[in-house]
Amino acid sequence: MARVKRSVNAKKKRREVLKSAKGYRGQRSRLYRKAKEQMLHSKTYEFRDRRAKKGDFRKLWITRINAAARQNDMTYNRLIQGLRLAGVDIDRKNLADLAVSDEQAFSALCAAAKDALPEDVNAPAK
């Protein structure tokens, strides 16, 4: 069999790794072995955090909705329950956006939710 010389491919591979490791601190941006290891960890964090971001944003939306709901004398869970009973189908992202940008519309939704809720807290839903 013919001898395989891979200097061109190996250099290209190393150059790509070092290029993608730019901005890392210390040896992690200059030494191939350290840079490669850091790239593997970076990809792991990248994958994990793309999924975690969805939950983080949901928590942020719920916090914003709860704060705005309390300004309208409601709690978050009563607001969501009232909106569901009133037949208002709006997701938390848009509800949080309304709470921040359009307080009058959010107050109208709170009023609709209050009307749909039963008077007695422990009473079953309509």
From Swiss-Prot:
Superkingdom: Bacteria
PROSITE patterns: RIBOSOMAL_L20 (PS00937)
One MF annotation (Gene Ontology) recorded for this entry: rRNA binding
Assigned GO CC terms: ribonucleoprotein complex; ribosome
Keywords, in A-Z order: Ribonucleoprotein, Ribosomal protein, RNA-binding, rRNA-binding
Record-level GO BP terms: ribosomal large subunit assembly; translation
Entry-linked Gene3D superfamilies: 6.10.160.10, Ribosomal protein L20
The keyword tRNA processing is assigned to this record: no
PANTHER family for this protein: 39S RIBOSOMAL PROTEIN L20
NCBIfam families to which the protein is assigned, alphabetical: rplT_bact
Record-stated family: Belongs to the bacterial ribosomal protein bL20 family.
Function summary: Binds directly to 23S ribosomal RNA and is necessary for the in vitro assembly process of the 50S ribosomal subunit. It is not involved in the protein synthesizing functions of that subunit.
Protein name in the entry: Large ribosomal subunit protein bL20
